[in-house]
Amino acid sequence: MKPSPDAKETVSRFEKLLVALANSGIDFAVADGLAVIFNGYPRLTLDVDILVSDAPENLRKLLDCLSHWGEDWARELKPEDFTPQPGAIRVIEEFDLDIFTRMGGKTLDYFRPRLRHIKAGHVRIPHLSPADLIFLKQDSSRDKDKLDVAAMKEILAREG
């Protein structure tokens, strides 16, 4: 599989927000395309997907942090908007941020024991593991998800 040459630029576009989330003490993990990149398969992604704990205090911290990002389109969101339903809340700013409280029917606590971390500045950014990305993407019919699954399987095989 040929990696995308723009992967480093992709990560740096999102780094400021991810560092702000980590510095704010928000309980979250990066998922989907950016997590694939963080796990070692460079490819392009245009958005950030995060899985957050739906604890009320965590959601308040998240919304406070987002109120200082971009044009503050997240200001209209309230903790009550984050229901335990499938799907994401999308915040559109410099790039799209998709916020999930469940992925594949599972909460962040389900994925927590296998979370991995990448260092950005002086903070560690949590992200989903290759095995969990495979779990979430394996039944998808999208070509990019099939490529991600193959890449994550390759990474797991290399890790032994």
Regions found by a protein language model. Give the residues of each.
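Compositionally biased terminal segments of proteins
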Residues: 1-160
